[in-house]
Amino acid sequence: MGSEMCIRDSGKVAIKIHTGEKNGPNILPREMVMALQQHVPDSNLVETNTFYKGDRYTTAGHRETLKVNGWDFCTVDIMDEEGAVMLPVKGGKHFQEMSIAKNMLNYDSMIVLTHFKGHTMGGFGGSMKNIAIGNADGRIGKAMLHTSDPSNPWEYSQERFMENMAESAKATTDFFGKQIIYINVLRNMSVDCDCAGLAAAPPTTPDIGILASTDILAVDQASIDLVFALPDAAKHDLQERIESRRGLRQLSYMKELSMGNDQYELITICLLYTSDAADE
């Protein structure tokens, strides 16, 4: 999925990560994230608080989790610390606007750095899920996208949840326009999200590599295609999780919303990564 880097040479850059719960065994390596961040001028890691009550429900608890998990080598902006704003959802059938973390508007560009894996509700978590849930604020936006019934914020249908996520993500993609890039890291692919922390199921799918694109649909589609192309024994658990949750609706609905292209070309780039890279 070859494309030129779209991030501006000047301006503030948000690197959207997923904190995960404390001591999660499958989160992205600290050294990998540090190596990227240190090569992007004027960049911060960015996150938002959770909808469910846990260690990341409050900003104070979230910052403690960030410290435990090693995300303390640079500034981390909890983007909904100061509230939320409503951004338009162009072409949405469920939402006309979405409640997004207020501080996202302070950035000129975004790098969506995603640990691709399974997800209990969404089937899988790729770039779209990272910004759909991850840029919505913890109190209003996440409640909006988790429900099809406003009176019951945990009542949802699986297909509606996928569509809600895509529309939430579209608020972010429309805001940044061409100033956004997506990186999916296909390693330690448990069937569970990093929200599961130590309770996450051990990965049974082998590591594949890293995908990058300026097209959100292409990068998630390619990630799914690479997983589904694995031998049956290697892909079984993750594919079952994705299909049983109707996770592929994420892709088809992004296409309906004209968020990207599900046709792509894979261009292989061989890079040697070592833990020393962050020190260079």
Task: Give the label of every model feature segment.
Residues 3, 8-12, 17-34, 39, ...:
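Extended, low-polarity segments enriched in aliphatic/aromatic residues
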